Amino acid sequence: LNQKHRYTLRFIWCGSEEQGLLGSRAYVEAHKEELSKILLCLNFDMTGTIVGSHRLMVTGNSEIDHYIKFLAKEIGFITKFCDDVHHSDSAPFANEGIPAIGFMRDGQAGGHSRFDIPWPLSGEQLAAATDYAKALIHRIDSARTFPFNRTIDPKMAETVANYIHPKN
């Protein structure tokens, strides 16, 4: 990624996800004027665990889904795919109409409990997800036009809104 970029890349870290997405909600609220310029959110949550398999979760549209599947196949990144709302820091962005790709590994046990400890992390698994993310960012950044629409399918947008603002 040591090159001049076609698009602005912004890396943010959000705190207090487990307490209700407090950091990502605060970021979205503090940057309302800039949100229309954000084309995509990549969210990394539980990507480096030894147990499980890679998973990419698209909160967006089928164009994004096809794009990431093609790239994964092209570079040999073995992963599962799903289209759903990632219950993580990308959700407040998706609620504002910003598509998201969630990077994670499924199959880990003990998350969000006293058993949520760092020893089951794998540098190899984290590197695999990072290599795919770098390839994705490079591919998008090298495109003459942004490669997919900045949209979230209506049914998915409704699911996001219900997650962000639950009706108790």
Question: What is the role of each PLM region?
Answer:
Residues 5-6, 33, 43, 128:
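A short, structured beta-strand-centered segment in the mid-to-C-terminal lobe
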Residues 1-4, 13, 31, 72-76, ...:
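Sec/Tat-exported extracytoplasmic proteins
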